[in-house]
Amino acid sequence: MRGPVGVRRDIEDTMRMLKLLRRNWCVLIDDRPSYLGMLQKIKDYVTWGEVEPDTVAALLKKRGELEGGRPVTDEYVSEHTEYDSVEEFARAYCEFEAELDDIPKLKPFFRLHPPRGGYERGGIKKPYTLGGALGYRGKAINDLLERMI
């Protein structure tokens, strides 16, 4: 949501560790406790939730980028992984059977547009629970990502 400019050094370092280097970038991480602690630390600058396989597949197909700027295709996934399509890989990823590192040369972030229709009414300065866009939002992250892809 918000970029790392003008923030405390420890928050900037945490955002760098998560590869969130610019506004409107997206990374997919699992729910291990160390990641959840990092998200709590930067909760006033990002939003997060649980993604569905359809959203992961759309992210990979439309915004996934390989080294050299090449797009992620079904052919590339079937040649370089044990999965036949991006949708099958996304399903396996959401069930914790695959990692994004299984796709060779995939960049670890997704560069997204600002959301169509804007952020929630409270903007990017209030938490999601108070009508804003920041912090934990659960399954509602899928709606936001669909508007940003």
Curated annotation (Swiss-Prot):
Gene for this chain: rpl30
HAMAP family xrefs: Ribosomal_uL30_A
GO biological process: maturation of LSU-rRNA from tricistronic rRNA transcript (SSU-rRNA, 5.8S rRNA, LSU-rRNA); translation
SUPFAM superfamilies documented for this protein: Ribosomal protein L30p/L7e
Biological classification of the source: Archaea, Methanobacteriati, Methanobacteriota, Methanomada group, Methanopyri
Protein name: Large ribosomal subunit protein uL30
Keywords from the named record: Ribonucleoprotein, Ribosomal protein
Gene3D superfamilies per UniProt: 1.10.15.30, Ribosomal protein L30, ferredoxin-like fold domain (3.30.1390.20)
Family: Belongs to the universal ribosomal protein uL30 family.
Provenance organism: Methanopyrus kandleri (strain AV19 / DSM 6324 / JCM 9639 / NBRC 100938)
Alphabetical list of Pfam families matching this protein: Ribosomal_L30
Superkingdom of the source species: Archaea
Subunit structure of this chain's protein: Part of the 50S ribosomal subunit.
Gene Ontology molecular-function annotations: RNA binding; structural constituent of ribosome
Any one cellular-component term (Gene Ontology): cytosolic large ribosomal subunit
Entries under InterPro entries matching the protein: Ribo_uL30_ferredoxin-like_sf, Ribosomal_uL30, Ribosomal_uL30_arc, Ribosomal_uL30_euk_arc, Ribosomal_uL30_ferredoxin-like
